[in-house]
Amino acid sequence: DARFYSHTGVDFKSLFRAVLKLGRAGGGSTITQQLAKQLWSPRANNTLERAMQKPIEWIIATKLERLYSKDEILLMYLNQFDFLYNAVGIQSASQVYFSTTPKDLKIEEAAMLVGMCKNPSLYNPVRHPERARNRRNTVLSQMEKYGYIDKATCDSVSALPLTLHYR
């Protein structure tokens, strides 16, 4: 969600892109919409049910944006996210995958966990380490693109192997 800090809960540009490409180019859901789904949407059994849930998520996401700061929303999202292996939330995931706390994660570890948020099963570092490493590197490239890290850091960290301290 590259525009997380600039949208109001629903990113219509991303939503329009997802509709045009039938969801193949990436989802149109913002972090806030995903949080709304995690907290309030029951599991949909089919595409029609899922389509009917979307407008409700938009309303909830807009309300969340009015009630909470962006940082609070991001924290709620990361504390609700299921990183697999009974690791719900960033604190638990940091322990399960790296035997550390979130504040002590290395950049490559944090990028891997963020990468899992796109699809935890697909980018499961235990079962699919190469996929997880590639996704981590995509996150690092995005961090460089948006100015969070420089090119040298991106290149050096991307070259590192995926190193888990899985418990």
Predicted regions and their residues:
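Non-catalytic structural connector segments
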Residues: D150-R167
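Peptidoglycan glycan-strand catalytic modules in the bacterial/periplasmic cell-wall system
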Residues: D1-D150
